């Protein structure tokens, strides 16, 4: 099939030790792939004023085992059943504490770089459950380390498969944030690289009221929240899609839509009606999609 050889070569280049899905061998990614993932993730976090994370190599066995299960079964699950092909306890732990992507077996599957997987988690446009859960883990200032895994290649019957996993919590130890914690995390924010945005992505806002005890941030009341998005031309129609306090990323989140954003246009966002321990909270910030900030 045209392109099969190229797909296999692109997948193979990611590994220092190639995976063998038929034998349930996860393999090992290269040092350069590991470094590239960490660099890209910290580039994304920096665009939001969030401190960088470190890489926990000791957790990579979990993420590689989880990616192996997703690739072998052609599905994604945070709670994989024990009868799955290539099931393992480390893989199940990794699956339950990570962002997941891929998990598809098809002769037509296109190759995705790990950077594309990261941006996919950031935009959350293809999230199977509408919302910004993957994004909130990527951007949480209280996530201070990660581990990555991916497994892919061609199957014996000529199909293609690939899966990626990013562990963000349930580490043996979790150091404090490596830098100042912002007052809020918003998407998009500031002069924002357009390569990190995709039309159709929900906008989001998470207030950080306690920079020490992360769990206190779940007590922010969003019930009366209002969002106003505007440009120099006036108010942009917007709608709150969700008010979430489920603990994802250790913060509440407003998820809202504002139509199709235009690159180069400055947007102003006002968030009002929030409260914490009975005290009102109001926020304002600006963003512009910048298509000149790199590839």
Placement of each model-derived feature along the sequence:
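N-terminal targeting leaders of exported, membrane, and organelle-targeted proteins
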Residues: 1-73, 144-145, 151-295
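Extracytoplasmic/secretory soluble proteins
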Residues: 14-15, 38, 64, 76-94, ...
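Surface-exposed loop/turn and secondary-structure junction residues enriched for glycine/proline
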Residues: 53-56, 79, 103, 141-142
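A short linear-motif detector with a strong N-terminal bias
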Residues: 76-77, 124-128, 183-184
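A well-ordered secondary-structure block
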Residues: 85-163
């Amino acid at each position: 099939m045209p392109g099969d050889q190229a797909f296999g070569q692109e997948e193979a280049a990611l590994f220092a030790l190639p995976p063998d899905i038929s034998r349930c061998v996860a393999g090992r990614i290269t040092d350069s792939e590991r470094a590239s993932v960490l660099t890209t993730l910290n580039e994304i976090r920096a665009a939001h004023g969030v401190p960088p994370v470190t890489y926990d190599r000791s957790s990579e066995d979990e993420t590689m085992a989880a990616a192996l299960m997703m690739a072998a079964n052609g599905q994604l699950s945070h709670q994989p059943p024990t009868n799955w092909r290539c099931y393992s306890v480390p893989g199940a732990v990794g699956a339950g504490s990570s962002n997941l992507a891929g998990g598809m077996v098809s002769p037509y599957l296109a190759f995705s770089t790990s950077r594309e997987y990261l941006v996919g988690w950031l935009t959350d446009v293809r999230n199977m459950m509408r919302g910004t859960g993957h994004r909130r883990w990527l951007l949480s200032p209280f996530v201070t380390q990660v581990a990555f895994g991916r497994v892919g290649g061609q199957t014996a019957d000529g199909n293609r498969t690939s899966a990626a996993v990013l562990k963000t919590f349930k580490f043996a130890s979790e150091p404090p944030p490596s830098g100042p914690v912002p007052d809020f995390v918003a998407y998009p924010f500031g002069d924002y690289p357009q390569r990190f945005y995709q039309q159709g992505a929900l906008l989001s806002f998470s207030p950080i009221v306690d920079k020490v005890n992360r769990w206190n941030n779940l007590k922010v009341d969003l019930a009366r929240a209002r969002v106003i998005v505007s440009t120099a031309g006036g108010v942009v129609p917007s709608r709150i899609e969700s008010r979430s306090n489920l603990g994802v990323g250790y913060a509440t989140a407003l998820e809202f839509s504002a139509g199709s954003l235009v690159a180069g246009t400055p947007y102003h966002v006002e968030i009002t009606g929030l409260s914490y321990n009975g005290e009102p909270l109001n926020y304002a910030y600006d963003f512009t999609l910048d298509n000149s900030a790199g590839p």
